[in-house]
Amino acid sequence: MKNLVVFGTESHPKLTESICEHLCLDIGRVELSKFSNGETSVRIKQSVRGCDVYIVSPASGQVNDHLMELLIMISACKTASAKKVTAVLPVFPYSRQPDQKFSFSGAPLSDLQDAVVPCKKQTGYHPWIAQSGTLVADLLMCSGADHIITMDLHDPQFQGFFDIPVDNLFGRPLLKHYISLNIPNYHNAVIVSPDAGGAKRATAIADALGLDFALIHKNRRHEYGTSLMLVGDVQNKVAILIDDLIDTAYTLVRAAEFVKEHGASKIYALVTHCVLSGDAIERVKLSCIDKLIVTNTAPQTITPSGCFDIIDVAPTFAEAIRRIHNGESISILYDHNQVWV
């Protein structure tokens, strides 16, 4: 394809290479290094004048270093007269951090006694959570990015932080496709969301496959702390847990144990973004999850085996890049019945 260049940071070279293979392109030549004091150095080793440039950089590993590489590469390409620069962020950096005031209080009071509200001593200082999501959006735009491509944002409202187009691709078609081809007797399965936040994602897959849906609800007003409640029936059925991200694996393992207690015969977990930090891999192996299926939006230390499987997202991102470069619609990428392999 004419005037199309794809670069990659050091965050996920294999994904960049795979995307370029599907596009029948060579990876753009760039030299990434660090000075002795740790500062990042970027040298674009080919002309990008008048080109449509895409830079692949998922948030993984040394997130801050890779984010800095991305920002400098975007700026370097714009300085070198690139026609357009698109940041391809399969895993969006800092998308898990909320932009809201920190609160010690938790749920609001349900009733008052004697019209007296007990108050803790006020120090005059109210801690705040930094607005990291807004900051990263501003950094990307200030560096010169014209377009953002990502997948399964942890909070879709992040799209509103940008003044440039943002295409939030869905991992649902890939997960649906995997379920229909690789899970035996999936027609007797129940799609389960481990929390209320992922209900919309899970119900979309359940509706596309014509399956029942269940939800694990956390009741934080329980007098003894947080309690779990299952909304739906998994008795003697295959439970398929759907989530957007797995990191420490505590949430997913706890959800798997909960549906097992409620009679699930077998448990699969399908997750878009897989980080698996610390001893998460061992935690999953020792859990009642029969198989964990993830995508390669981030580099994976696990290998496909009896306990794990990996879905390749490179064809999806390659097709998105091809369509955007050619000025075609990408709406077909949101169709649950369309999958690129």
From Swiss-Prot:
One of its GO terms (biological process) is ribonucleoside monophosphate biosynthetic process. It is an enzyme of class 2 (transferase). Mg(2+) binds at residues 152, 154, 167. GO terms for cellular component: cytoplasm; ribose phosphate diphosphokinase complex. Pathway: Metabolic intermediate biosynthesis; 5-phospho-alpha-D-ribose 1-diphosphate biosynthesis; 5-phospho-alpha-D-ribose 1-diphosphate from D-ribose 5-phosphate (route I): step 1/1. It is found in: Cytoplasm. Gene3D superfamilies: 3.40.50.2020. Keywords: ATP-binding, Cytoplasm, Kinase, Magnesium, Metal-binding, Nucleotide biosynthesis, Nucleotide-binding, Transferase. Its EC number is 2.7.6.1. It comes from the Eukaryota. It catalyses: D-ribose 5-phosphate + ATP = 5-phospho-alpha-D-ribose 1-diphosphate + AMP + H(+). GO terms for molecular function: ATP binding; kinase activity; magnesium ion binding; ribose phosphate diphosphokinase activity. InterPro entries: PRib_PP_synth_CS, Pribosyltran_N, PRibTrfase_dom, PRTase-like, Rib-P_diPkinase. 5-phosphoribose 1-diphosphate synthase involved in nucleotide, histidine, and tryptophan biosynthesis. Active in heteromultimeric complexes with other 5-phosphoribose 1-diphosphate synthases. Belongs to the ribose-phosphate pyrophosphokinase family. This is Ribose-phosphate pyrophosphokinase 5.
